[in-house]
Amino acid sequence: MAAESDVLHFQFEQQGDVVLQKMNLLRQQNLFCDVSIYINDTEFQGHKVILAACSTFMRDQFLLTQSKHVRITILQSAEVGRKLLLSCYTGALEVKRKELLKYLTAASYLQMVHIVEKCTEALSKYLEIDLSMKNNNQHTDLCQSSDPDVKNEDENSDKDCEIIEISEDSPVNIDFHVKEEESNALQSTVESLTSERKEMKSPELSTVDIGFKDNEICILHVESISTAGVENGQFSQPCTSSKASMYFSETQHSLINSTVESRVAEVPGNQDQGLFCENTEGSYGTVSEIQNLEEGYSLRHQCPRCPRGFLHVENYLRHLKMHKLFLCLQCGKTFTQKKNLNRHIRGHMGIRPFQCTVCLKTFTAKSTLQDHLNIHSGDRPYKCHCCDMDFKHKSALKKHLTSVHGRSSGEKLSRPDLKRQSLL
């Protein structure tokens, strides 16, 4: 007991904020930066661990390649992407209210869930304010002339900026299955917001006048996510606001989809491919799923072994371990052996380390190179155990066994087959 009383426990309340400030200072001095992000040819120096913790998209890119240079092309301006990445260090984001939708779309592409939630909440708030202002315009004029308190309240609301905060005490929503009653409430909310959008005269939501000035700025304070969620491995789930019914994936699905599709259609020429990412090895990962957000965003990861689907890749990977499967983060293909996954990833990255000394052709696997060398040497090492045929390639033997003998290469011989082979 005496030994336990001698232990002193220190809790540093501002440790996280102080560390982020110091890392941002080091980033500005270009010290210890291990990655360069190119957003529409605009360079952003940063640290992989910080960017991966705040953006699921960036984390997946870092897992796919060890390159120090990652290139991203977005339909929004490069400044939008730069501010989003900078918010990973500062915990705050200044957004002009008329540009909320631009940041919402870009943050959705970068999978910065906490920013998407706050932008969605702010956007829905201003839509509600605009609708109420239209319906009660005459009544408001009468109240302003008769009630000085209401007039002062309106004057206070006409400010240049608004501060929206995510408190550290906000709980982390780790229940990805929305209850039926919550889903019904959410559906009615989304339908009301959609109908309000249709009533507006402007065809594009990002330029619609919803009752604020062009120079007004909305400041989003993004505090650190609760440590309880981090300990449980839930990196992608945001801190929920007081409006618990605003569930991220469904809300984003309803508010972003039509705008993303219209913006992709507006891009002229050969830019209609949408959003994509490029690494230094020259491999591209097209993101055409953004154009089809309405069809598959709610359950982007479908298990190949069971009917379960998942929104976040962390939960999907954890589930695949139960089936003893390995996932390729680039194309979503699964493998039963890790070595096959590594070989598959080398194909994505264009790495072909095995070269034929005769014709200089390169391959991703040593076994493939060996089969290729059989062409030059004339060897036919793969023997059929059912007949006298032999083959240069293992794949040709498998095809022969399946099509001719109706069996797989690993299937054991029956007794008559063994007797026939012994006679031969």
Swiss-Prot record:
Biased composition (Basic and acidic residues): 408-424
Gene Ontology annotations of biological process type: negative regulation of transcription by RNA polymerase II; regulation of cytokine production; regulation of immune system process
Gene3D superfamilies (alphabetical): Classic Zinc Finger, Potassium Channel Kv1.1, Chain A
SMART domains in the cross-refs: BTB (SM00225), ZnF_C2H2 (SM00355)
C2H2-type Zn finger ranges: 301-323, 326-348, 354-376, 382-405
Keywords tagged on the record: DNA-binding, Metal-binding, Nucleus, Phosphoprotein, Repeat, Transcription, Transcription regulation, Zinc, Zinc-finger
Superkingdom as given in the UniProt entry: Eukaryota
Annotated GO CC locations: mitochondrion; nucleoplasm; nucleus
Sequence segments annotated as region (Disordered): 402-424
Localisation: Nucleus
Domain BTB: 33-97
Tissue distribution of the protein: Widely expressed with highest levels in brain.
InterPro entries reported in the protein's UniProt record: BTB/POZ_dom, SKP1/BTB/POZ_sf, Znf_C2H2_sf, Znf_C2H2_type, ZnFinger_BTB_dom_contain
PROSITE patterns: BTB, ZINC_FINGER_C2H2_1, ZINC_FINGER_C2H2_2
Residue numbers bearing the Phosphoserine modification: 202
Any GO MF annotation of the entry: zinc ion binding
Purpose: May be involved in transcriptional regulation.
Protein name: Zinc finger and BTB domain-containing protein 6
